[in-house]
Amino acid sequence: MLNCGDSSKDNNDFSDKDASSDAQKRYGIKSAVVEYIITGSQEGTKTLYFDKWGMRQAEYTRSVLTVSGFSKSINLVNIIDGDYQYMINIDQNSGTKTRNPILKSMDELKGQKGFNEFGEQMLLSIGANKIGKEEFLGKDCDIYEMRNIGTKLWVWKWITLKSETNSRGLEINVTATRINEGSVPKDKFTIPEKITLNEVDLDNIENEMREENK
């Protein structure tokens, strides 16, 4: 168990120089803040902060999910920074620390040249297929569909600006309302104080599951 207040203490942070090559770019812009509203079965807000071309990002989500008449409050922070990802439940002062899954995907797709190819391969790897184009918030978006989970994504420079999910009786829409390109305060990527983290090795879990299924 780890008590954390600063993610920079236990990861190898990417410098701007490291992220300057296309091989270290998730998104097509260097840094921005994107604000969203969440509607449907889940209602609330989400804010995405990122810099270093998406190699460092934080998502703050506050919402209420209603299923079959029962409601649950959601207050989550998801930080990706350097070697690690931190998924934090603010209300419970707890979370998990795992290896950064983006780095694993980049290694698997290292034959792709340029963020355009990498971004598309990332979407294809999760079962998304491009079905069209549409302007949204003044941006030219590509529309991708994941039929297996009933989701459509509106993607601009590999940033999802809008998503619609309709699956198993749940309808959840996440819609960007504002995009502010420019620098992001560093404290947005800092783990809140008094959070207890449980470190989880997802690779070990996957390997154990494979062994059990043999």
Spans of model-derived segments:
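Extended soluble regions of mature proteins
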Residues: K9-K214
